[in-house]
Amino acid sequence: MVIVAVTSLLTPFFQSRSDLRPEHDIPETTQIATNDSSSNQTAGTLIMPTTIDIVSTTSAFPFVQRWVAQYENQQLASSGSVNVDYLADREISVAEGGSGRLSDLAIVGVPGKNNNSMYIPVSAQAVAVVYNIPSFPDVPSGLRLNSTTLLLILNGSITQWDDAAIKDLNPSLNLPDQRIVVVHNGGDNSDSSSSSSLVLLNQYLGHPNSIWPKNDSIAASGPAELAEMVRKIPYSIGYVDFSYAVQTKMTYAAIGDGNGDYIVPSMQSIGHSVDIALQVHNYSTDRSPSQVQQPPPPTINASRIVSDSYPIVGLYYASLSAIDDDKQEEEGRRRIVAMLDFVKWLITESGGQQTLLEVEYPPIYPGNEQLATYAKITIDTIQKSLII
């Protein structure tokens, strides 16, 4: 449990959090403090234990579960208490985009449309094309696949591993005379239910919708089962978030870019894609703070991805609900304060960004002043909308 004070709203964006510790002499349920400049007397702010609910797209599970655990551990060490309840069994579809959810915060792979949520990037997102060829080593062996060949495999037009199109890309590999088994997410059957991983994959393929092979495909219930199936089924192929591929030590392909180079997903190649292809839309500077309008969320512009950059890359976002009348009640305000505290931790270099290294994702905030400014203004906008 971690206690977060309302005064945390006023702390600088990347400020050390040691000043959030409560006074030991103050009663547990009521800490009243005000700062009277004329008398130099301090009385306190109401500090109450707060629980926030978090949901995420299932593809983000490997690092979101780490975020929640490490945030609570770090805050316990500093005598605070926000209880973060991660509803890991609830999937967020692309159509939802975090809107209409029964939670305080959602981690999503695609910003929703036609809702009032605000989106702050929290991590890179990359899709690994994973496969199981028993005669190949159980490490990233670098089977080469380009967008044309991969599309033909996934739609069932190419059915054999030793097809001429695959052999042309991999002349040094002894490809087996075996049928290809395509494993896909069972929910990836329409635009309204597609996972963010499939959205990114289809963007790379240049094909808006996926048509899975009728006779040689298997539907998994989600990314965890998809990864497990590919590991168990010989001669299978599928797609998962890179963090799942790393966590389960899967074999994944080197993917062709527009220049004819083949890039294996890694912290370096994903980070390079983010560095060169991140597109941040600036806030308008000619408005008063109360009139600031949220620009479109930052995105990865695929057309900017060049050599040495993994081509199937996007972003994960913290989807923050717009402030409504219900959230202006005392309990609602405290939950928003706690939620913003968690989001601030996610994007700090020593907090959530450091945690990403455990799944071989690159931190996206260190050295990126434009992205940090975007996040700060977004958080400030929400804070100013609160009635304290």
Predicted segments with their positions:
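Hydrophobic membrane-insertion alpha-helices, especially the h-region
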Residues: 1-9
